[in-house]
Amino acid sequence: MPRLTPIVNYRNIGISAHIDAGKTTTTERILFYTGVNHKLGEVHHGSATMDWMAQEQERGITITSAATTCFWSGMSNQFSSHRINIIDTPGHVDFTIEVERSMRILDGAIMVYCAVGGVQPQSETVWRQANKYNVPRIAFINKMDRTGANYFNVINQIKDKLYANPIPIQLPIGKENNFVGIIDLIKMKSIYWSEIDQGITFEYKEIPKDLMVLSNSYRNILLETSAEASEKLTEKYLYKNLTEQDIIEGLRIRSLKNEIIPVTCGSAFKNKGIQSMLDTVINYLPSPKDIKYSKKNKFLSKNYKKSILPKDNEPFSALAFKIANDPFVGNLTFFRVYSGKIRSGNTVLNSAKDKQERFGRIVQMHANKREEIKEVRSGDIAAAIGLKDVTTGDTLCDPLHPIILEKMEFPEPVISVAVEPKTKSDQEKMSSALNRLAKEDPSFRVSSDEESGQTIISGMGELHLEILIDRMYREFNVRSNVGKPQVSYRETIKSCVEEEGKFIRQSGGRGQFGHVWLRIEPNKSNIAKNKNNYTFINKIVGGAIPKEFIPAIDKGIQEQLSNGVLAGYPIVDVCVTVFDGSYHEVDSSEIAFKIAASIAFKSAFMKASPILLEPIMKVEVETPNEYMGDVIGDLNRRRGIIDGMQDINMGKIIISKIPLSEMFGYATDLRSQTQGRASYSMEFLRYNELPNNITESIINSNQLK
């Protein structure tokens, strides 16, 4: 079957934002104006297409990334039909994993900002994730109708907080209640949307006289920005005039190189600015043909020598970026095709696990609705039914042309709770449910406390775990008792120590003999490229320890990293060197050297000024002025450090750094202090050394368990 849409007309985009910036409403308007939906879905009514989970509809927030497809030919039908594959991602920091894996497979992104709140903590997190994968972006400054809206303030924040180069291609006409339309700086026309038909129709008019000077000023910036894209455009700018198409061409070149961020504006809720923003997606975000899929941009693993070409006649390659459990069809594997094509019933190689898998059925997803299709090609995003052993980040490829795409990296959990089923008969059901949820969400971990036998679940925040426990009940009918949240501390050292470890058992018959000297020191370089930032160095010379025993020494140390020494928490940021030792020709074995290494490591660790590290969160509290003193006092009591304050309409944003352990229950306390008028956001910042008195308390508490 021939391709219906040329790949040059594909746009694989994500829509990302801080919570409450209006991202899902923006997506709903896109679906309405592109004809996918025939009525407007509203977040506050619980009727948003993309927020289909019960928890999303109840809470009015996005929890899981949702995929859909629409087609767009331009406001004035100036384009041939373009296929836009959209992934709507969560705005809450607890679900940042959904943004991470979406950014990995997207070609472009729309960053939505609230015209009042501007660039907020999760906006910065999402920006870093987009930078990591070098994703070209446009900005949509939403909620221009809200009290306190300030378009130019948000542009300055994009510049100052995100270190980006925002280039306005539109200006708002009015603001707050007087926001009525936009000025298109490329056409130099104003656009007004009809309020009678929900913004479906619009008209171009002349720019209001009182905005002409401002428009000309920003138009000149636009012309200069575009002219810098190439010598041809520079010459034309200097000696002739740039046409509308020249300006778009120059901005596109620079946008695809991530040199600029085209900025648009509007009000999704008031049905203004969405169609013109869609035109911006077509003009300035890349098609798959514009992206280089190679080792150089960290797309391919280092072992692969070629680049991937997004052509249908190339060998098949795809990345599985999400696993979801569907109550009707079982596991759904979401994947992005980079080259070639695949039909339902075909067999592919999961090169990450070296296993072949059969594509049972292929479906096109529209939020939680499935449309069965027979074939997908390069550039497509779809889901497969029937893949048995695929996990997030696995490469699927032609068995005759194996390839490995660079795997995704996921953040380590920062919070844990103990869970147990309300009835013993549900123990097996709970284990099965938790394992299925963990397969879906790589930032969610399930483990067992060896001493107490309790099941421990770990995640990115209180809300993250609360949602997963709720899902366990709704989707798997397992009720559970949940313990108090526990912080995921880390252990490390501050000094360098050399230590000997011996394990000798020689009491008749075959004995055991292992003898090592280890040097352990802080690993501050962060070059280890593993989650613990652990480096192992072998400096044995002269055969003091045979080569075959060196891996056992490394293994003995790594087991201690997982179990901890000081208080039972994972050990991070250590470099261990084995530099001497001895062996017995008959009695030495792998197990003996493994135990000897463990003995030496534990002893050295306790002598190397061990400390506990705690997760520190960046917390931003938005509060009316009259409660500012109470809020700051409470943050100080929580061991918070105030980094700064920003003025907002009738209030302040207080920016602080606070240990996660002090933030449990903060939402309730803040509501109480401010009569429900303040709000806060929080994201993980880094690990810091724990004060001595709290360290001693935690060690003593863990020893009593």
From Swiss-Prot:
**What Gene Ontology terms for biological process does this UniProt record contain?**
ribosome disassembly
User: Which SMART domains does this one have?
Assistant: EFG_C (SM00838), EFG_IV (SM00889)
State the UniProt keywords alphabetically. Cytoplasm, Elongation factor, GTP-binding, Nucleotide-binding, Protein biosynthesis
Name one molecular function that GO assigns to this entry: GTP binding
Q: Which InterPro entries match?
A: EFG_II, EFG_III, EFG_III/V, EFG_IV, EFG_V, EFG_V-like, EFTu-like_2, G_TR_CS
Subcellular location(s): the record lists: Cytoplasm
Query: Looking at the keywords, is Nucleotide-binding present?
Result: yes
Q: Tell me which residues bind GTP.
A: 17-24, 88-92, 142-145
Principal localization? cytoplasm
Q: Name one Pfam family in it.
A: GTP_EFTU
Domain tr-type G: from-to ranges: 8-289
Has keyword Nucleotide-binding? Answer: yes
Q: Which GO terms describe its cellular component?
A: cytoplasm
Q: Which family does it belong to?
A: Belongs to the TRAFAC class translation factor GTPase superfamily. Classic translation factor GTPase family. EF-G/EF-2 subfamily.
Report the function annotation for this chain. Answer: Catalyzes the GTP-dependent ribosomal translocation step during translation elongation. During this step, the ribosome changes from the pre-translocational (PRE) to the post-translocational (POST) state as the newly formed A-site-bound peptidyl-tRNA and P-site-bound deacylated tRNA move to the P and E sites, respectively. Catalyzes the coordinated movement of the two tRNA molecules, the mRNA and conformational changes in the ribosome.
Name listed for the protein in its UniProt record? Elongation factor G
Natural source organism: Wigglesworthia glossinidia brevipalpis
Which lineage is the organism of this entry classified under, starting from the top rank? Bacteria, Pseudomonadati, Pseudomonadota, Gammaproteobacteria, Enterobacterales
Q: Which gene encodes it?
A: fusA
